[in-house]
Amino acid sequence: MNREERLKRRDRIRNFSIIAHIDHGKSTLADRILEKTGALSEREMKEQALDSMELERERGITIKLNAVQLHYKAKDGEDYILHLIDTPGHVDFTYEVSRSLAACEGAILVVDAAQGIEAQTLANVYLAIDNNLEILPVINKIDLPSADPERVRQEIEDVIGLDASEAVLASAKVGIGIDEILEQIVQKIPAPSGDPDAPLKALIFDSLYDPYRGVVAYIRVVEGTVKAGQKIKMMATGKEFEVVEVGVFTPKAKVVDELTVGDVGYLTASIKNVSDTRVGDTITHADNPANEPLPGYRRLNPMVFCGLYPIDTARYNDLREALEKLQLNDAALQFEPETSQALGFGFRCGFLGLLHMEIIQERLEREFNIDIIATAPSVVYKVYLTDGTELAVDNPSNMPDPQKIERVEEPYVRATIMVPNDYVGPVMELCQKKRGIFGDMQYLDERRVTLTYELPLAEIVYDFFDILKSSTKGYASFDYELIGYKPSKLVKMDILLNGEKVDALSFIVHRDSAYDRGKVIVEKLKDLIPRQQFEVPVQAAIGNKIIARSTIKALRKNVLAKCYGGDISRKRKLLEKQKEGKKRMKQVGSVEVPQEAFMAVLKMDDQK
């Protein structure tokens, strides 16, 4: 193509994404748009066409991004090229959302006509506003009996401050309002700007690993043009590659000659390692590089850590390979080898949040058939020692001696919780219990309240979200952002079996709740660890101080069975002999800890 054709093509491109809270109908709307523009035939339409991971469809959430090129003939007779970039709505994947929004000029904001605005809708709208996107409100699910579009329209204006007078009333399920949405995309979302002849600048907004082609980078070209055979350079890492092919998704991959300004597509360059195509990085030409990269790139830091160990130790290398493969598609996943006396060899893994952690564990079991055991999730603590050194501790068993510690700081998050006002009490009680600091309370309308709390991240990683959902009958929505570190009275609790520490059962706990927590765990372990031939004390200790204890009773053989009637001294002799034997056994015996015992420490239902 020459310059004129490229510019003409650029003016007909519209790049947009869809933002919505979970379950407000984003994937269904995407399906309808694909159907309307003829991207998928009737035969190929399956629910949630863009959610290609089996797990995504099963959980009904979008984890990875997808980008599709659609062709739409508008009412003005022009043929437009629409690029729909799908975004995940879950709080763990905020960075993925911000990158996919950076690749767009506009966003469709989907709000459920019955539910109204929820916490994650807000979080994502603010990201869109930060990226200066044109936002088109769509009020979805108007076919529901409980729909109240006028109230929601008012809410969009009051809470977000968007003009919702032209908001499209739609029902993606039934197919109402889809034409209007497409027309609004064409008329209201601006065409991309940028010069097709300038030095190349392309934003990587996702990457995935293909066993045959290496890494496939999903890119949005902001300036310049890229073709097969050119040498490219990644601006964050400085590595250079040669482009093998470029193409677009219609949702299936289709090779094209070039990608130019405004295009969204993919490129392969026999890149072996996904960490070379960092999401948010800028691709430029190696021989004619751009002066500076596109803004907004940052390295993702994991927030939650846990140990993953194969149940069958022989599969250690399989686990490493599986994690490496998952890391190819998931730059946020980090792992390094670690060993534990109790569990053998495994990996310490870092995740963005809890959902991310669960999904990785589930994919290891599902896609790679590796049975794993996970230790309790923990966060990164900053430990200041009396000699002035500062440590970052992400594994409870690395916590130094209490005598050496001057203070410990833990990460805090600012949590925004939206909840119907009938449930404000239980939610505030939950936050109090989790050591929350009350920030602010605002009424959105007569029915809904936004609460702001500062909470320790460590209190959220266990079961906060589950309890929040169950205490509000599923109505609360929750979003959090990291605000920094604060000093806390934290101690490390060790669990001793038969007088020996079991490193994998250690955890860090707030001093005030240490006693209760220790008691519950000790009782739980007593029931889970099988009885031995000798009695086994189970103890919880902080430093050298034992704070809770329970005993697993010994299994005993009835040594008196042979004595009929016999003399009491004869019986006593046999019992004494048995006792001696048990004592000897106890000195040499070791205790096997079953899988469930580790799980018990994590899944403390009655945690507090």
UniProtKB/Swiss-Prot annotation:
Report the residue ranges that make up the tr-type G domain in this protein: 11-193
One record GO biological process: positive regulation of translation
Tell where it localizes. Cell membrane
Enzyme Commission no = 3.6.5.n1
Q: Which Pfam families match?
A: EFG_C, GTP_EFTU, GTP_EFTU_D2, LepA_C
Name the catalysed reactions. GTP + H2O = GDP + phosphate + H(+)
Matching SMART domains, A to Z? EFG_C
Q: Does the keyword field hold Transit peptide? A: no
Please name the HAMAP family in this protein's record: LepA
**Into which family does the record put it?**
Belongs to the TRAFAC class translation factor GTPase superfamily. Classic translation factor GTPase family. LepA subfamily.
Q: What is this protein called?
A: Elongation factor 4
Species per Swiss-Prot/TrEMBL record: Anoxybacillus flavithermus (strain DSM 21510 / WK1)
In the UniProt record, the gene name given for this protein reads lepA
